[in-house]
Swiss-Prot record:
Annotated residues for binding of anthranilate 1: 84, 115
Cofactor stoichiometry and binding remark: Binds 2 magnesium ions per monomer.
Keyword presence, Glycosyltransferase: yes
Name of the protein in its database record: Anthranilate phosphoribosyltransferase
Segments passing through the bilayer: none
Length: 344
């Protein structure tokens, strides 16, 4: 039986689940502009109140992947995305963006998917522009950057143009919806390994099972007990790990990796310019909480990418490439690559 918007809404208001294949049908209709804005808003709000299930999220993400402009990375060995949902409210500098250059310098291939700021002071796209990089790379150029340098940034509006269909509704609603957690699940390069930060501990188990359904090989989904959508220095971090087809959950703390506990306030910024300054200080090897949190998250990325044996080994590799200048060199190469003359 086909799933219509009306049937879906009826199911939702009765607090009944939409099955994954039904969600695929529904999302295709939404993305093809076959559902009115009023119905889209009602469905999104209803899902939020009911709480989205693993199958519903996986079905929606499947369709977003179908409609995306793909990045074809030839050598997928150690290919990883480092991404967060955002929305944690802490306004830290761009930790995952800094970590991508560190992870690439240590041997991973990073296909980072991101956007401008929505709720933070500086989104990944914003800080990359502040660093002098162009964020307007087309899919072939991103693939070339990953192949040549080991890192590429995929600006969400370029790779998900169909999102314009729901943008007016989301903007007018002004509340979190399923789309806030779909972005990190829809990497256009289909990176088989992923380090994902989420803003809510309840999402750790959900998102790691969604990634399993979507065919990820390895994944770490993390949320600090302080609500940070990264591995946190301020407290323990809840981790959901997918490896070998199995999912497990555990906690890690900064002390596990020889790091001092440090309040998140030490990582806060007020603008992209401040985030840029903190990021460059890290890549220059300036000791402190910012360097520690980048090493911790880059270390986790190196582990999930299969470069490091465990997170601790990854942290050691991350520190090495920060202090020997290789991570800063990767940043410089990437900025130069994005600014080169392009054929029109």
């Amino acid at each position: 039986m086909s799933m219509t918007a009306q049937k879906a809404l009826q199911r939702i208001v009765e607090h009944r689940e939409i099955l994954q294949d039904e969600m695929v049908q529904l999302m295709r209709q939404i993305m093809n502009s076959e559902v009115s804005g009023i119905m889209v808003a009602a469905i999104l709000a209803g899902l939020r109140v009911k709480k989205e299930t693993v199958g519903e999220i996986a079905g929606a993400a499947t369709v977003m992947r179908e409609f995306s402009r793909k990045v074809n990375v030839q050598d997928r060995t150690h290919l990883v995305d480092i991404v967060g949902t955002g929305g944690d409210g802490w306004h830290t500098f761009n930790i995952s963006t800094c970590a991508m250059f560190v992870a690439a310098a240590a041997g991973a291939k990073v296909a980072k998917h991101g956007n401008r700021s929505v709720s933070s002071k500086s989104g990944s796209a914003d800080v990359l522009e502040a660093l002098g990089a162009s964020i307007e790379l087309q899919p072939l150029e991103v693939a070339e950057a990953i192949g040549c340098i080991g890192v590429g940034f995929m600006f969400a509006p370029i790779h998900h143009p169909v999102m314009q269909v729901v943008s007016p509704v989301r903007r007018e609603m002004g509340v979190r919806t399923i789309f806030n957690i779909l972005g990190p699940l829809t990497n256009p390069a289909d990176a088989p390994n992923i380090l994902m930060g989420v803003f809510d501990p309840d999402l750790v188990g959900i998102q790691v099972h969604v990634l399993h359904k979507l065919g990820a090989e390895r994944a770490l989904v993390v949320c600090g007990r302080d609500g940070m959508d990264e591995l946190s220095l301020g407290t323990t971090t809840l981790v959901g790990e997918l490896r070998g087809g199995r999912v497990c959950e555990y906690e890690v703390s900064p002390e596990d990796y020889g790091m001092a506990v440090s309040p998140i306030s030490n990582l806060r910024v007020e603008s992209s310019a401040e985030s840029r300054e903190m990021l460059l200080n890290v890549l220059a090897g300036k000791p402190g909480p910012a360097l520690d949190v980048v090493a911790l998250n880059a270390g986790a990325a190196l582990y999930v990418a299969g470069v490091a044996q465990d997170i601790g080994h990854g942290v050691a590799l991350a520190r090495e490439v920060i202090f020997n200048g290789r991570a800063r060199n990767i940043l410089n190469q990437y900025v130069a690559f994005t600014r080169r003359p392009r054929n029109v």
